[in-house]
A protein has these predicted regions:
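Acidic, proline/glycine-rich low-complexity IDRs
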Residues: 1-21, 25-30, 34-172
């Protein structure tokens, strides 16, 4: 295989138009499908909460635009407000560009010319979502650049919380 991981993709989210803000109408942001990548040793058929949460959150994110009359696109984040499962501290998702995929994998042009965008969702830590809120989605995406797009329950956070920083007091 070209990639040594599972690639899960929604099917049907793009059949429904999302409600995009007026300033984005006509920009082909109204249809999308979502992708999440799991490591090859992930127990993909397990229904246990510690393993099923990526599938659950793929579904949650896919249903969100229709249920909330909203839209999802690059840089949007959704928080769970608590860790997804007891085996990780990851607690939110960011909608990102497709990484580690061939050029053109991020779009599907339908026979009628309409476009369905494909976005990857990547799990985040609470402090990474807080960073986006206090800074910007562009800064968070830049900070996440280079992380493996495959879910890693224990990947290091890309943020260092102020309360966790260790400051030295200069000696006199």
């Amino acid at each position: 295989p070209d990639h040594n991981y599972y690639t899960l993709v929604t099917m049907g989210m793009g059949a429904h138009r999302m409600t995009v803000p007026p300033n984005f109408e006509g920009e082909n942001f109204d249809r999308a499908e979502l992708v999440i990548c799991l490591p090859p040793d992930w127990p993909i058929n397990s229904n246990s909460d510690i393993w099923f949460w990526p599938v659950k959150w793929l579904k949650v994110m896919a249903r969100l635009p229709g249920e909330q009359n909203t839209w999802l696109a690059w840089g949007h984040t959704v928080s769970n407000n608590e860790p997804f499962a007891e085996n990780t501290k990851l607690s939110g998702m960011i909608v990102s560009n497709m990484t580690d995929f061939d050029e053109g994998a991020d779009k599907c042009i339908l026979p009628n010319g309409e476009c369905i965008n494909f976005y990857q969702i990547i799990p985040l830590y609470r402090e990474e979502i807080e960073f986006k809120v206090s800074h910007s989605k562009d800064e968070l995406i830049h900070m996440l650049d280079g992380i493996d797009p495959v879910v890693d329950l224990n990947r290091p956070s890309q943020c260092v919380s102020e309360s966790k920083k260790k400051f030295a007091i200069p000696s006199e």
